[in-house]
Curated annotation (Swiss-Prot):
Binding site for ATP: G640, P641, N642, M643, G644, G645, K646, S647
GO biological process, one term: mismatch repair
GO cellular component, one term: cytosol
General function of this protein: This protein is involved in the repair of mismatches in DNA. It is possible that it carries out the mismatch recognition step. This protein has a weak ATPase activity.
Keywords, ordered alphabetically: ATP-binding, DNA damage, DNA repair, DNA-binding, Nucleotide-binding
GO terms for MF: ATP binding; ATP-dependent DNA damage sensor activity; damaged DNA binding; mismatched DNA binding
Annotated organism of origin: Albidiferax ferrireducens (strain ATCC BAA-621 / DSM 15236 / T118)
UniProt-listed InterPro entries: DNA_mismatch_repair_MutS, DNA_mismatch_repair_MutS-lik_N, DNA_mismatch_repair_MutS/MSH, DNA_mismatch_repair_MutS_C, DNA_mismatch_repair_MutS_clamp, DNA_mismatch_repair_MutS_core, DNA_mismatch_repair_MutS_N, DNA_mismatch_repair_MutS_sf
Gene3D superfamilies given in the database record: 1.10.1420.10, 6.10.140.430, DNA repair protein MutS, domain I (3.40.1170.10), MutS, connector domain (3.30.420.110), P-loop containing nucleotide triphosphate hydrolases (3.40.50.300)
Protein name (database record): DNA mismatch repair protein MutS
Length: 882
C-alpha cells in the first residue's frame, strides 16, 4: 500500500502580508492539507509551493516561480483545464488524491474571484468515466478495529449505489481486503500498531491510497443513523444489517468520507448488502493467483479465465460477470438460476422455437452505454450532456430487449420486468437535450431547440446575426463606394467594419475608429454598436439560460434515479448471461449438475484458457481427461514428468468447479458436483524477499493455512509439496501432509509429486488412488501424451525434459551415467523406511523386582506380622540389598 495520508491539523493563520489571492489559496488549502489542490485560474488549474513541486515530479510538468508573496517566491505549476482528466488519471494511478477548486463567483474587480472546492477526486471515489476502467470498480473501504480480535468492514463504489457490510476476525482481514480489492482504504487514528501492520500487510496489487481518519468518525451509532438515512427506513432488519456494531462504525466513516469527496449527500445509495464469509466459496489469495482468474502470474490482464469469459457488450455487464466469478456462493440457488437462464437463451422460446435468441439480445445490447455509472453521475449532478444523450439512446433499446425476452424462462422474465425505465424519463431526455450537444454545458448548444421559448428567442438573435451583417455590408458598400469594405466579428474586438488604408479617406463621419492595423482600419457605427450590444447580450443570456435549464433537467431526473438503477442492474445481468451463453456454445461447454451428496465427477474435462491458447497458436488439440472423486475416492496421488500436464490437469478441475459454482456452463462433456465451500491451492512459489521469506517458508505457510482451513467440502490442490528442502525432509513432510489431508481433513485432494515413494500411499489409505500423466519414449526423445491414466508413473523422464530444454550433450551424458549408478545402488539396498506405517507403539519395560513382589502380595490374607515382614522385604528391594 502506498501514499499514506493522515488527517493533519490545519496550518496556522495566513500571514497578513500575503496577497489577497494567495490568502484565498491558503485558506482553501488549509481544509485539504494532504491533498493536491487544483486551483482554477482562467484556463489553467494551478498548484503552488509543495503541491507544485510534487505535481511537477509526478506529472513531469514545468515548475516555475512567479512574483512573491509574504516575501517568498511563489513556486507554481499548472495544467490546462481542458485536458485535466489526463493528468487526474495519472495521479489517481499513483494513489494520489486531488481537490478541484473552481471559480464560482463573477469577476468584480474588487479582490479575487470567489472560489471553492467542488469535489475531491480520490482513488476510491472515482465517478468520471474517463478515469474509471470499464471492467473494474473503484472501491472505497473503511476498516474499524473492534474488540476481542474482531473488525468491521464497510465498502462501496460511488457509481454502484450500494453499501456492503461485513464483520470478521482479524486473522481473516487480509483475505477480505483482497476480495474487495479497494483503490483506497481508510481506518481510524485510534487503531493499534499491530492491527495497522496487519492491514497494511494485506496482499494488494498496485498503488492503494491509505488515509487515516479521526477516531470519532468511526462511531457505531452514527453509522446506523447514516445507513437508515440512506435507505429512508426505520430499521435495518429488512436488509439483515442490524446488530453489526463494528460494521456500522466503519460505515459511519465510509459514508462521511464519500460525502466529503463528492461535496454532497449520496442520494443514489439506497441499498445495503451484508456479506458473510460462510455464504461464499472461499477463494484465498493463492487460489486467485494460481488459477489466474483475473491476472496472469506475470500480472497481465490476459490470457486469464475472466478475459476468456468476458464477451460482454457493456462495461456494467463485464463488472457483474467478474463479480460472479470472484464471489461464487455456497448456496446453489443463484448458480442454478443462471444455468436455467443460459439453457433458455440457447434454446429460445419453446412456443415459437426462437433458437438463437441470445444473438438477437447481444445485437440489441451492442452500443449500450454504462447506465449504472451515468445514473450515479446524474445523482451527483456531475453528468455531461453527451452522457445523457447516450442514456436516452440506450433507454430506447430497452423496449426492444423487453420484447425479445418476453415469454422466456422465469428468471429472464423477472429481468425483463426491470428493463423499462419510466416513459417520462426518456421523454424528458429526448425533448431537453440536443442530439449532438457540446462536450460541456459552458460551451452552449446543449439544450434542444423547442424545449424553452426564451432560449429559442435568444438563439434566434444570434442566428440572424449573419444575415444582418451581410445586409449591413451591402448597404455600407453602396453608401461609401468602398468595394472591398467588410463587416466582421471576432471574440477580442467584437463587431467592426474593416477598410483598407487606401480607402480610409472615403469613410463617412459616423464611422468611429476601433482598431488600427498595418494595412487596414477597423471602425464601428452607431447602428453596428447597437446590434453588437444586443447580439452579445443575447449570447451571454442564452448561455446563462442553458446552464439554468440544464440544472432544472438534472433536478427533474433525480426522481428517476431508483428506476434507472434497476434498469442498469437488469441490463448488466442480461449482458452477462448472454456472454456466458455465447461462451457455452462457441466453446462447446456443458451444463453442470448439482447434487447433494459428496461428488466431483467430470467427464472429458478441459482447461478452457489453455485450450483457447492452443487453438490460437495451432499447437494441436487439447487432451481432455476424466475425474472421479467421491466419499470412497477423495485423493489422487499424481505422478509424471515435468511438462507432462500435471499442473494443467489440477488447475482445470479447480476452474471447472469454480465455473459451475458461479452459474456458468463448464468445459467438459458432463459434470456432477456436490457441495463445495472452498478451493485451496499450493502451486509453485517464489522467494518473498521483501518479507524475508524463502520459497520453502512460503510453501510451508501456504500448506499450513490449507490444513487449518480445509474441510471435507473443500477442493485442495497440492503441487510438489516439500521440494524446497532436502529430499528426506521434503518426503517426510509431503507424506505427513498427505496423511493429514486424507485421514483428518478428508477434502477432495489432488496431490502432485515427484517423490516416487508416495505412490505407496494408496496401498495404506483406502480413499486415495494413484494416477499419472502418460508419456512415451521415442529413442532418447519423449512424447507427452497429456492423458491421465490409473497407476503411478514408471519414471520421471527428467533427462529427456532437460534435452528438450537445450541442455548441452556433455551434461546429459554425465547425468545418464550418474542416474545409472544411483539406480544400481538403490537396487542393492532394498530396505526402505515405511513412510505410512502407524507410529510405533511405546516399548514396555520388564517388571522390576519391587513390582513383582508387590504383585505377589494379597493384603487380605496377610496377618499383621506377615504384613510387617513384607514391608521390610520391599524396603530391602528398594535399597538394592535383596
Amino acid at each position: 500500500m502506498q501514499n499514506e495520508k493522515t488527517q493533519s491539523k490545519k496550518p496556522s493563520p495566513v500571514p497578513a502580508e500575503h496577497s489577497p489571492m494567495m490568502a484565498q489559496y491558503f485558506g482553501l488549502k488549509a481544509d485539504y492539507p494532504d491533498t493536491l489542490l487544483f486551483y482554477r485560474m482562467g484556463d489553467f488549474y494551478e498548484l503552488f509551493f509543495a503541491d507544485a513541486e510534487k505535481a511537477a515530479r509526478l506529472l513531469n510538468i514545468t515548475l516555475t516561480q512567479r512574483g512573491q508573496s509574504a516575501g517568498q517566491p511563489v513556486v507554481m505549476a499548472g495544467v490546462p483545464f481542458h485536458s485535466v482528466d489526463t493528468y487526474l488519471a495519472r495521479l489517481i494511478k499513483l494513489g494520489e488524491s486531488v481537490a478541484i477548486c473552481e471559480q464560482v463567483g463573477e469577476v468584480t474587480g474588487k479582490g479575487p474571484v470567489e472560489r471553492k472546492v467542488v469535489r475531491v477526486v480520490t482513488p476510491g471515489t472515482l465517478t468520471d468515466l474517463e478515469l474509471l476502467s470499464d471492467k473494474s470498480e473503484s472501491m472505497l473501504l473503511a476498516v474499524h478495529q473492534g474488540p476481542r480480535n474482531t473488525c468491521g468492514l464497510a465498502w462501496l463504489s460511488v457509481t454502484q449505489g450500494e453499501v456492503h457490510l461485513a464483520e470478521c476476525a482479524v486473522d481473516d482481514l487480509a483475505q477480505w481486503v483482497l476480495r474487495i480489492a479497494p483503490g483506497e482504504i481508510i481506518f481510524s487514528a485510534g487503531t493499534t500498531p499491530t492491527f495497522e501492520a496487519r492491514l497494511r500487510g494485506a496482499p494488494l496489487a498496485g498503488a492503494v491510497s491509505v488515509s487515516v481518519r479521526p477516531d470519532w468518525q468511526f462511531d457505531a451509532g452514527l453509522g446506523e443513523k447514516k445507513l437508515l438515512a440512506q435507505l429512508q427506513a426505520a430499521s435495518l432488519a429488512p436488509w439483515q444489517a442490524q446488530d453489526l456494531p463494528q460494521a456500522h462504525a466503519a460505515a459511519a466513516a465510509l459514508l462521511g468520507y464519500a460525502e466529503h469527496t463528492q461535496g454532497q449527500a449520496l442520494t443514489h445509495i439506497q441499498s445495503v448488502r451484508v456479506q458473510r464469509s460462510d455464504e461464499l466459496i472461499d477463494l484465498p489469495p493463492t487460489t486467485r493467483r494460481n488459477l489466474e482468474l483475473t491476472q496472469t502470474l506475470r500480472g497481465e490482464d490476459q490470457p486469464t479465465l475472466f478475459s476468456l469469459l468476458d464477451t460482454c457488450m457493456t462495461g456494467m455487464g463485464s463488472r457483474l460477470l467478474k463479480n460472479w466469478l470472484l464471489e461464487p456462493r455456497r448456496d446453489r440457488g443463484e448458480a442454478q438460476q443462471r444455468l436455467n437462464a443460459i439453457a433458455a437463451l440457447q434454446s429460445g422460446d419453446a412456443h415459437t422455437s426462437r433458437a438463437g435468441v441470445w444473438r438477437q439480445l447481444r445485437e440489441q445490447l451492442k452500443g449500450s452505454t454504462d447506465v449504472e455509472r451515468i445514473t450515479a453521475r446524474i445523482a451527483l449532478r456531475q453528468v455531461r450532456p453527451r452522457e445523457l444523450v447516450a442514456l436516452q439512446l440506450t433507454l430506447q433499446k430497452t423496449e426492444l430487449l423487453t420484447h425479445t425476452t418476453r415469454g422466456l424462462e422465469v428468471y429472464l422474465t423477472q429481468i425483463s420486468g426491470h428493463l423499462l425505465a419510466p416513459e417520462a424519463c426518456a421523454d424528458l431526455l429526448a425533448r431537453a437535450i440536443d442530439p449532438e450537444p457540446a462536450v460541456l454545458v459552458r460551451d452552449g448548444g446543449v439544450i434542444a431547440s423547442g424545449f424553452d421559448a426564451e432560449l429559442d428567442e435568444l438563439r434566434a438573435i444570434q442566428t440572424n446575426c449573419d444575415g444582418f451583417l451581410l445586409d449591413l455590408e451591402v448597404r455600407e458598400k453602396a453608401r461609401t463606394g468602398i468595394a472591398n469594405l467588410r463587416v466582421q466579428f471576432n471574440k477580442v474586438h467584437g463587431f467592426f467594419i474593416e477598410v483598407t488604408q487606401g480607402q480610409v479617406d472615403k469613410v463617412p463621419d459616423d464611422y468611429r475608429r476601433r482598431q488600427t492595423l498595418k494595412n487596414a482600419e477597423r471602425f464601428i457605427t452607431p447602428e453596428l454598436k447597437a446590434f453588437e450590444d444586443k447580439a452579445l447580450s443575447a449570447q451571454e443570456r442564452a448561455l446563462a439560460r442553458e446552464k439554468w435549464l440544464y440544472e432544472q433537467v438534472l433536478d427533474q431526473l433525480q426522481v428517476f434515479v431508483p428506476a434507472l438503477t434497476r434498469v442498469a442492474r437488469a441490463l448488466a445481468t442480461l449482458d452477462a448471461l448472454c456472454a456466458l451463453t455465447e461462451r457455452s456454445l462457441t466453446l462447446d461447454w456443458c451444463a453442470p449438475q448439482f447434487v447433494k451428496e459428496p461428488c466431483l465427477d467430470i467427464t472429458q474435462g478441459r482447461h478452457p484458457v489453455v485450450q483457447a491458447r492452443l487453438a490460437e497458436t495451432s499447437s494441436g488439440a487439447f487432451i481432455a481427461n476424466d475425474t472421479r472423486m467421491g466419499p470412497k475416492q477423495r485423493m489422487q496421488i499424481i505422478t509424471g514428468p515435468n511438462m507432462g500436464g500435471k499442473s494443467t490437469y489440477m488447475r482445470q478441475i479447480a476452474v471447472i468447479v469454480l465455473l459451475a459454482s458461479m452459474g456458468s456452463y463448464v468445459p467438459a462433456s458432463a459434470c456432477r458436483l456436490g457441495p463445495i465451500d472452498a478451493i485451496h491451492t499450493r502451486i509453485g512459489a517464489a522467494d518473498d524477499l521483501a518479507n524475508a521469506q524463502s520459497t520453502f517458508m512460503l510453501e510451508m505457510l501456504e500448506a499450513a493455512q490449507i490444513l487449518i482451513a480445509a474441510t471435507p467440502n473443500s477442493l485442495v490442490l497440492m503441487d510438489e509439496i516439500g521440494r524446497g528442502t532436502s529430499t528426506f525432509d521434503g518426503l517426510a513432510l509431503a507424506s505427513s501432509i498427505a496423511t493429514q489431508l486424507h485421514d483428518k481433513t478428508q477434502a477432495y485432494t489432488l496431490f502432485a509429486t515427484h517423490y516416487f515413494e508416495l505412490t505407496e500411499f494408496p496401498a495404506q489409505h483406502h480413499a486415495a488412488i494413484n494416477v499419472h500423466v502418460s508419456a512415451a519414449e521415442a529413442g532418447r526423445d519423449i512424447v507427452f501424451l497429456h492423458e491421465i491414466q490409473p497407476g503411478p508413473a514408471s519414471k520421471s523422464y527428467g533427462i529427456q525434459v532437460a534435452r528438450l530444454a537445450g541442455m548441452p550433450a556433455a551434461v546429459l551424458n554425465q547425468a545418464r551415467q550418474t542416474l545409472a549408478a544411483l539406480e544400481s545402488q538403490a537396487t542393492q539396498n532394498q530396505a526402505q523406511v515405511d513412510l505410512f506405517a502407524a507410529p510405533p507403539a511405546t516399548e514396555t519395560a520388564a517388571d522390576s523386582a519391587i513390582e513383582t513382589a508387590v504383585a505377589a502380595l494379597n493384603p487380605d490374607n496377610l496377618s499383621p506380622r506377615e504384613a510387617l515382614e513384607a514391608l521390610y522385604q520391599l524396603k530391602k528391594l528398594a535399597s538394592g540389598k535383596a
